[in-house]
Amino acid sequence: MRREELRLGLVAYPGLGGSGTVAAELADRLARMGHRVYLFATSRPFRLPEASPAVHVPVDLPYYPVFPGPLYTLSLAGTLEREAKRLGLDLVHTHYAVPHAAAAYLAFGEGLPLVHTLHGTDVSVVGMDPAFHGPTRRALEAARAVTAVSRALAQEAKRAFGVEAVVVPNAVDPERFRPRPERKRLYAEEGEWLLVHASNFRPIKRVPDIVRAFAKIRKRLPARLLLLGTGPEEEEARRVAAELGVAPWVT
């Protein structure tokens, strides 16, 4: 029996962070299953394949001198409200609650089913900031469903916002992500261990500390460190690698 086709709107950050990666992969897979999927982001998410049937809907960041900066939350809310009507969306699913949950609630109130997925620092760090906590809590309380990527995060969301989150762990596609010796040889010599870190290099990711840990590993066995991503801690990580004498083995 053919499943019902849904018109789904997903909201995400487009960069290298985990929440954007999960959202882009989910959008692509849902679209390939036959649903009409629209991914809202300020630019095309880097993990959304060029050939994906999911459609990127750009969110503009208009700037007016009267404001201190671009009003992302309002722009996203306006884009969601306008495009949901035009596209006939059945549901909107946001990834990373701040400010996506509040923007979706501002756009629809309780007039359209909203699902919010919590990814980590949107609860533990950013979401606890007094500037964001109240609006985020109200948006989560009004949602049709809230999910979290781990039991620990669901428990933290309960303490922080008083919401019950369903645990839906991030998935791994074993057909795509499996040991490939020929790929490892692109980065490491025969007999070397290859360590990989992937993130958006924000301070909470502690990338310089990863380099420090790697320097200790290098003293005990041959290894290389592959850092995938970019962000504010990139230069500091490079500096630490040079200071500890492991820069030739850090890429």
Each model region followed by its residue ranges:
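Carbohydrate-associated surface elements
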Residues: 43, 152, 171
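An aromatic- and histidine-rich active-site surface loop
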Residues: 73, 91-111, 118
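Conserved donor-binding/catalytic core segment of Leloir-type glycosyltransferases
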Residues: 11, 147, 188-214, 226
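A short, histidine- and acid-enriched strand-loop-helix "catalytic/donor-clamping" loop
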Residues: 89, 107, 112-130, 142-145
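Nucleotide-sugar donor-binding and catalytic loop/hinge architecture
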Residues: 1-6, 180-194, 220
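Nucleotide-activated donor-binding/catalytic signature segment of Leloir-type glycosyltransferases, i.e.
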Residues: 235-251
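Acidic anion/phosphate-binding donor-loop and adjacent secondary structure
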Residues: 126-127, 172-186
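N-terminal strand-loop element at the rim of the active site
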Residues: 10-17, 23, 28-74, 231
